[in-house]
């Protein structure tokens, strides 16, 4: 069982991810924005982070920048609901995200990515 931190300002997305990941046997922690997520990760590093890109207070990109400065080996999957904004997800990859997904995304594909990243 892995511990996964979900960072997303949309409660419905967090709930869907939490339910899916818990059903797959993972422990889940949640944060509603990048600032909360970074603070949680500093207190208790997790095996994987799934973060939205566009959020209030501290965006996913800003959070990734701070995270990768402090934690070089943090595993991150970035998600974005902004249609056509490939540059945001491309930027996330440049900042250290291992995988990226556009919302809405296939939960099967996300779970496959989660399992792969946890194994590597």
Which positions does each model-derived feature cover?
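Receiver (REC) domain active-site loop signature in two-component systems and cognate sites
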Residues: 55
